[in-house]
Amino acid sequence: MEITNVTEYDAIAKQKLPKMVYDYYASGAEDQWTLQENRNAFARILFRPRILIDVSKIDMTTTVLGFKISMPIMVAPTAMQKMAHPDGEYATARAASAAGTIMTLSSWATSSVEEVASTGPGIRFFQLYVYKNRNVVEQLVRRAERAGFKAIALTVDTPRLGRRESDIKNRFTLPPNLTLKNFEGLDLGKMDEANDSGLASYVAGQIDRTLSWKDVQWLQTITKLPILVKGVLTGEDARIAIQAGAAGIIVSNHGARQLDYVPATISALEEVVKATQGRIPVFLDGGVRRGTDVFKALALGASGIFIGRPVVFSLAAEGEAGVRKVLQMLRDEFELTMALSGCRSLKEISRNHITTEWDTPRPSARL
């Protein structure tokens, strides 16, 4: 049967993958309320389409930190992709490059920055956690720079790992044939099996709980790469991020895997956008499964979106071809949404093209 939308890959991945692996990718924190809400909140935003506009030519191109991409749909960092498919991050990198968009490589990838760079040309960002051993951080950043990565996406919502109960039940550990490639030779490559979630105990020992805004400034002393602060959900933190020198913000709740009962990212987006006053770009990840979702995020002020789970699920189902198809389906749906809303370019997508539950009722138009 032909796959006609992004969500269908979820069920295929669930069939194909070992339970421990599928659950690791699919689950959220605790009650998983935010996990559902990331999707549900999109469904409560409705369109106000404009009609009788010539939409014979639609331009979806945009620039992110000065890099031109084919569409405002990018690949978010997701860990350990070789658990999904033997080609892992290699396949994702090639698919993103073929789609003319940006891939963000996770620190906890099962392929190294050098290996991903070797797949060929492409605009790539590197996701970073700050470790207690700052020397490790410096080495990772240097390697990403040397491998031609163009920006650092600094994850700031993980001073501790969220409680993902399925990982505890499954005693999640990295399968024995795989390793966290960026840490090879740093004595951090292999995770031990633990009676809790193996990842939790591994990370608990490595991630620095003292991480603060001064570390964002420290990072700028060791690299010239632009820094995206990933995990901002409030206007207050958006303003501080700008003061701290961030080149951009990613509104993210870590795929609902950290603190449960935070709002959906699409619900938090507008507050963050308003706080930044256009000084730096704001991006969003979390819950994007349709081209309509992409349009809604842009209408609320996002400069682009990132997708995570759809990438690993399509990777599990069909390898590189699956990831290519997900990016193509979202592109096609987004283009159709633009046409049916009367928008010919991204700059024509406005707040007036949508209505949200927190909008005040509009005065009725007088003839």
Curated annotation (Swiss-Prot):
Task: Quote the catalytic activity from the record.
Answer: glycolate + O2 = glyoxylate + H2O2
Keywords, in A-Z order: Acetylation, Flavoprotein, FMN, Glycolate pathway, Oxidoreductase, Peroxisome, Photorespiration
- Localisation: Peroxisome
Which PROSITE patterns does this entry report, sorted A to Z?
FMN_HYDROXY_ACID_DH_1, FMN_HYDROXY_ACID_DH_2
The annotated site for Involved in determining the substrate specificity of glycolate oxidase falls at 108
* A GO CC term attached to the entry: nucleus
What's the name of the protein?
A: Glycolate oxidase 1
Species, as recorded: Arabidopsis thaliana (Mouse-ear cress)
**Encoding gene per record:** GLO1
